[in-house]
Amino acid sequence: AHMERYGIPASITMAQGILESDCGNSRLSIMSNNHFGIKCKRNWTGEKVYHDDDAKGECFRSYPTVEASYQDHAEFLDTQPRYDSLFAYSPTDYKSWARGLKAAGYATAPDYAQRLCRIIEEAQLFLLDQPDGERLYASRSGRKITDPEGWFTDQTSMERPADASSAVDPDN
């Protein structure tokens, strides 16, 4: 739904969620359902949680559900001017989106774009960017997107993603 509404590739959203939250296992994602490491600066009026990241006790956005984190991520990319250039890319061009996110400063890891692309390719998430992507993904990968529990148990080559980036600071 976010891909149709915002034009953000589903594969990018999923890969960022996987990478930033360590497949939903990071302390931040468990404590606050924050699967994208988005900090609570500027005019954030929602719930907050404090977590040591680049500095001690940084403020992060907290969400009532995982779905709310994904919705806020889409709105965050859509409303932050530094990401405007990304929307010139096709929602099926995950490689340009990955490079563009890195260039716009989403993460500090020098290989952030490559890590996103590796996750997308290893997990076949690019299938989600196609028409009827959920059905196509389920038929080709043997997994349903709506039932992600245990998704990566068969992804033995998947690296530990939590080391890939630092949290997203809306002021940078």
PLM features: what roles do these ranges have?
Residues A1-D169:
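Catalytic cores of secreted/periplasmic lytic hydrolases that degrade extracellular macromolecules
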Residues N172:
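LysM (lysin motif) carbohydrate-binding repeats in extracellular/periplasmic proteins that recognize
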